[in-house]
Amino acid sequence: MRRSSGFGGQKGQGPSCSFTGCWCCRGDDVAESDDSPFAQCGYNIQEKHLGKLHRAASRGEVSKVECILSSGSADLDERDKKKRTALHLACANGHPEVVALLVDRGCQLDVFDNKNRTALLKAVQCQEEECATILLEHGADPDLPDVYGNTTLHYAIYNEDIPMTKKLLLHHANIESANKDELTPFLLAVHEQKQQMEDFLRKQKENLTAVKLESIHQVMSEYKENETPRNPQNSNPEGTSNKMACLGEGAAGAKVDEIPGNPVKRLFNKPSIDDSRPMSANEDFDFDTEEKATEPANGKRQNGMGIIESAPQEHTNNENI
């Protein structure tokens, strides 16, 4: 497993900073050449590469941003050469007033930069909670992963940012989302030895499990209540009355034969010797077989059974001789 190592800076900063409160003006080839997901928080920016809207947004110049948008001289969701929007730069540099303006103007919230990071993810990564809050309250998705598979929760955990983590969880961020190293936010905390975050997440998972169990119990209770059988005496009143009528007839002396479809009749109504109903050959054979145990020993029969039946008399005559 590749270790996702890196270094974080203070809020809104990396190792150094010389551009309006951010460390992002040292050249595009400095930190972004490091492929580690946690090697940098902000953007490396050269002003000459920015359009006027991006430049004003990255500096936090609210009135200038509004003027540019009102004049129609720039597209609200315009991208720079690294696919960043003005919203990305405002979030990374911590300008909530610009973020609010762009959102009110209807900008797209979940646009990806060249590393598949949304403006919300950049706000979380750079620990800009106010910017992140605006985006979350307007429906930004906290679970969209970047090229490393990390979501907003992974970066909040790595930064040991408990307030941001709480806010993300309140907006239903997925605590079980795994990155490309197969690390969930909790496993990332363990892997990076973030003990405070590990304890916090363990507590959150316990609370989440308790809530889930309570919901399951409630659902099961409602299911059992809906599936409880009604009183059998009332479940089929018509069928019950018919059964009672049959029982009443039996009590009044009705013959068993008179009850239609009576199973007792089917089981015990065997044909007798005096039965005048014509019998098939198979029925006659079955009858003889069943009755042989009850035939008298001296009874003569016109079939093979008669030979066995007359044997005792022949034996008696031999004794007399």
Curated annotation (Swiss-Prot):
UniProt-listed Gene3D superfamilies: Ankyrin repeat-containing domain
Chain positions covered by the region annotation Disordered: 222-242, 268-321
Top-level taxonomic group: Eukaryota
Protein keywords: ANK repeat, Repeat
ANK repeats: 48-78, 82-111, 115-144, 148-177, 181-210
Keyword hit for Oxidoreductase: no
Name of the protein: Putative ankyrin repeat domain-containing protein 26-like protein
InterPro entries reported for this sequence: Ankyrin_repeat_domain, Ankyrin_rpt, Ankyrin_rpt-contain_sf
